[in-house]
Protein backbone atom coordinates (compact mmCIF):
# COMPACT_ATOMS: atom_id res chain seq x y z
CA UNK A 1 0.00 0.00 0.00
CA UNK A 2 2.82 2.41 0.92
CA UNK A 3 4.64 1.62 -2.34
CA UNK A 4 1.45 2.30 -4.34
CA UNK A 5 1.04 5.65 -2.57
CA UNK A 6 4.66 6.61 -3.27
CA UNK A 7 4.27 5.52 -6.89
CA UNK A 8 1.16 7.70 -7.28
CA UNK A 9 2.95 10.67 -5.70
CA UNK A 10 5.96 10.23 -7.99
CA UNK A 11 3.68 10.05 -11.04
CA UNK A 12 1.77 13.18 -9.95
CA UNK A 13 4.98 15.17 -9.43
CA UNK A 14 6.41 13.92 -12.72
CA UNK A 15 3.24 14.90 -14.60
CA UNK A 16 3.20 18.34 -12.99
CA UNK A 17 6.82 19.06 -13.85
CA UNK A 18 7.51 17.28 -17.12
CA UNK A 19 4.13 16.87 -18.85
CA UNK A 20 2.14 19.92 -17.71
CA UNK A 21 5.30 22.02 -17.19
CA UNK A 22 3.68 23.82 -14.24
CA UNK A 23 6.97 25.13 -12.73
CA UNK A 24 7.80 26.66 -16.13
CA UNK A 25 4.54 28.56 -16.76
CA UNK A 26 3.34 25.67 -18.98
CA UNK A 27 6.14 26.29 -21.52
CA UNK A 28 9.03 24.05 -22.49
CA UNK A 29 12.30 25.60 -21.25
CA UNK A 30 14.45 26.77 -24.15
CA UNK A 31 17.34 24.48 -23.22
CA UNK A 32 15.15 21.34 -23.33
CA UNK A 33 14.90 19.30 -26.51
CA UNK A 34 12.30 16.95 -27.97
CA UNK A 35 13.55 13.49 -28.90
CA UNK A 36 12.39 9.97 -29.75
CA UNK A 37 12.56 6.73 -27.77
CA UNK A 38 15.03 5.45 -30.35
CA UNK A 39 17.36 8.37 -29.65
CA UNK A 40 17.32 8.04 -25.85
CA UNK A 41 17.21 4.25 -25.44
CA UNK A 42 18.24 0.96 -26.94
CA UNK A 43 15.02 -0.78 -27.93
CA UNK A 44 14.52 -4.52 -28.18
CA UNK A 45 11.92 -7.24 -27.85
CA UNK A 46 11.80 -10.59 -26.11
CA UNK A 47 11.89 -13.78 -28.13
CA UNK A 48 11.65 -17.45 -27.26
CA UNK A 49 12.04 -18.64 -23.70
CA UNK A 50 15.54 -19.82 -22.75
CA UNK A 51 16.36 -23.54 -22.80
CA UNK A 52 17.29 -23.56 -19.11
CA UNK A 53 14.21 -22.61 -17.07
CA UNK A 54 13.13 -23.17 -13.47
CA UNK A 55 9.75 -22.25 -11.97
CA UNK A 56 11.54 -21.19 -8.77
CA UNK A 57 14.62 -19.09 -8.03
CA UNK A 58 17.71 -21.14 -7.14
CA UNK A 59 21.44 -20.46 -6.87
CA UNK A 60 21.84 -21.57 -10.50
CA UNK A 61 18.57 -20.14 -11.88
CA UNK A 62 18.64 -16.69 -10.32
CA UNK A 63 17.70 -14.40 -13.23
CA UNK A 64 13.98 -13.69 -13.73
CA UNK A 65 12.28 -14.33 -17.05
CA UNK A 66 9.52 -11.80 -17.83
CA UNK A 67 6.72 -12.10 -20.37
CA UNK A 68 3.70 -9.95 -21.15
CA UNK A 69 1.29 -9.87 -18.25
CA UNK A 70 0.13 -8.14 -15.10
CA UNK A 71 0.30 -11.07 -12.70
CA UNK A 72 3.51 -10.88 -10.64
CA UNK A 73 4.78 -8.22 -13.10
CA UNK A 74 4.88 -10.83 -15.87
CA UNK A 75 7.24 -13.22 -14.05
CA UNK A 76 7.46 -16.44 -16.08
CA UNK A 77 10.27 -18.25 -14.24
CA UNK A 78 14.03 -18.11 -13.77
CA UNK A 79 17.12 -18.90 -15.86
CA UNK A 80 20.90 -19.02 -15.59
CA UNK A 81 21.92 -16.19 -17.99
CA UNK A 82 20.44 -12.69 -18.25
CA UNK A 83 19.85 -11.02 -21.61
CA UNK A 84 19.44 -7.49 -20.17
CA UNK A 85 21.84 -6.50 -17.38
CA UNK A 86 21.21 -2.76 -17.04
CA UNK A 87 18.30 -1.03 -15.30
CA UNK A 88 15.61 -0.77 -17.97
CA UNK A 89 11.91 -0.49 -18.72
CA UNK A 90 9.63 -3.12 -20.24
CA UNK A 91 6.32 -2.56 -22.04
CA UNK A 92 3.95 -5.43 -22.82
CA UNK A 93 3.13 -5.75 -26.50
CA UNK A 94 0.78 -8.75 -26.30
CA UNK A 95 -2.08 -9.63 -24.01
CA UNK A 96 -2.25 -6.67 -21.63
CA UNK A 97 -0.77 -4.18 -24.10
CA UNK A 98 0.98 -1.17 -22.62
CA UNK A 99 1.79 -2.50 -19.13
CA UNK A 100 4.96 -0.58 -18.15
CA UNK A 101 7.44 -1.90 -15.59
CA UNK A 102 10.79 -0.62 -14.28
CA UNK A 103 13.35 -3.44 -14.05
CA UNK A 104 16.22 -3.00 -11.58
CA UNK A 105 18.00 -6.36 -11.85
CA UNK A 106 19.34 -8.46 -14.76
CA UNK A 107 16.59 -10.46 -16.55
CA UNK A 108 15.43 -12.18 -19.74
CA UNK A 109 12.46 -10.79 -21.73
CA UNK A 110 10.35 -13.25 -23.75
CA UNK A 111 7.24 -13.32 -25.99
CA UNK A 112 7.58 -9.88 -27.63
CA UNK A 113 8.00 -8.00 -24.34
CA UNK A 114 9.42 -4.64 -25.46
CA UNK A 115 12.61 -3.54 -23.67
CA UNK A 116 13.93 0.01 -23.42
CA UNK A 117 17.43 0.35 -21.99
CA UNK A 118 18.13 4.06 -21.51
CA UNK A 119 21.23 5.75 -22.83
CA UNK A 120 22.17 6.95 -19.36
CA UNK A 121 24.15 9.94 -20.61
CA UNK A 122 20.80 11.27 -21.91
CA UNK A 123 18.05 9.86 -19.68
CA UNK A 124 17.55 7.66 -16.63
CA UNK A 125 15.45 4.49 -16.48
CA UNK A 126 13.28 6.07 -13.79
CA UNK A 127 12.51 9.13 -15.94
CA UNK A 128 11.75 6.89 -18.94
CA UNK A 129 9.47 4.72 -16.79
CA UNK A 130 7.52 7.68 -15.37
CA UNK A 131 7.18 9.25 -18.83
CA UNK A 132 5.84 6.01 -20.36
CA UNK A 133 3.37 5.60 -17.47
CA UNK A 134 1.82 8.95 -18.50
CA UNK A 135 0.88 7.69 -21.98
Task: Tell where the protein language model's regions lie, with residue ranges.
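Generic marker of residues within folded, mature protein domains
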Residues: 27, 55-56, 81, 106
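Short secondary-structure capping/turn segments at boundaries of alpha-helices and beta-strands
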Residues: 50-53, 76-78
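A short beta-sheet element
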Residues: 68-133
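Non-catalytic DNA-recognition/assembly elements of restriction-modification systems
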Residues: 1-50, 56-71
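Alpha-helix boundary/capping residues
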Residues: 44, 132-135
Amino acid sequence: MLNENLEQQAQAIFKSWFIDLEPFSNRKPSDWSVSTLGNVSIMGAGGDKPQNVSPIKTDLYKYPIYSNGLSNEGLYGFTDKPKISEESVTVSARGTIGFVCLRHIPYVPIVRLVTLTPKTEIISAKYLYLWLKQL
